A protein has these predicted regions:
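Short connector loops at secondary-structure junctions
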Residues: 89-107
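Feature marks short, surface-exposed loop/turn motifs that line or immediately flank catalytic pockets
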Residues: 66, 100, 145
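Residues at the starts of beta-strands that form the adenosine-phosphate
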Residues: 56, 89-90, 136, 168
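Active-site and ligand/interface coordination hotspots across diverse enzymes
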Residues: 1-73
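A short mixed-secondary-structure module that forms the rim of ligand-binding clefts
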Residues: 65-87
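Short acidic (Asp/Glu) patches
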Residues: 43, 72-80, 113-122
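Glycine/proline-rich loop-helix segments at beta-alpha junctions forming the active-site rim
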Residues: 2-3, 107-208
Length: 208
């Protein structure tokens, strides 16, 4: 379980670009040819965790917990199973907000603009990785998006980046009454990805 030790504004953030350089170098802790883990050390935030491939499924949750290479939590195990079932050769777990907190109630109340900007750079990078087609994005944040008022605008920024890369959005499982995409944890391993109109969804959410 991860409980934030401080506000992320109190940290000296590792910027995405140098963190990616480190993540692409050999590590004694895990196989860097299999895993993409940015930053490549456990910290109070995480930009990316996933497997390397030519046709990845990008899954977007709200915020990271404790998972690391070779130590996936149940949510990421589900993400990997569903990605493979739907014909992808790899998965990349990304989050609306990069702060680690196992309990979303522990997420910071004050949005850190610098952390978000670094996270956007990470997102644009993973959007560029699909070698076969337009990037595929699985919206999977569940109702947790209601936990903090800064989260929907963060999603809106991700949608804009996705448009520039001609990304295709999906969800899996039944959506909530308010239209939130289902969280991966309790989905069947044979869950099929369905088209998701992310732009209409976020426009309605921000209007409320």
């Amino acid at each position: 379980m991860h409980i934030p030790s401080c506000e992320t504004a109190e940290l000296e953030l590792i910027r995405f670009a140098p963190a990616l350089e480190e993540a692409n170098r050999p590590s004694p802790d895990y196989d860097t040819e299999r895993w993409l883990y940015v930053p490549n050390v456990y910290s109070e935030y995480r930009y990316i965790l996933g497997t390397r491939g030519k046709h990845p499924l990008i899954c977007i949750g709200i915020n990271p917990s404790t998972a690391a290479p070779d130590h996936l939590d149940n949510t990421l195990k589900s993400v990997e199973r569903i990605a493979l079932y739907n014909g992808f050769d790899s998965f990349l777990m990304f989050n609306v907000y990069a702060q680690r907190a196992t309990n979303p109630d522990d997420m910071e109340l004050t949005y850190n603009a610098q952390l978000h900007q670094e996270n956007l750079q990470a997102f644009d990078y993973i959007l560029s990785l699909d070698q076969n087609s337009a990037p595929a994005i699985w919206a999977a944040w569940g109702t947790i998006i209601e936990k903090r008022p800064y989260l929907p605008p963060c999603v809106q920024d991700l949608i804009q980046l996705g448009k520039a890369r001609h990304a295709v959005w999906y969800s899996a499982g039944k959506r909530s009454k308010k239209g939130h995409p289902h969280h991966p944890l309790y989905l069947r391993k044979d869950s099929v990805l369905e088209p998701f109109d992310a732009s209409s969804y976020i426009a309605q959410l921000i209007q409320k």
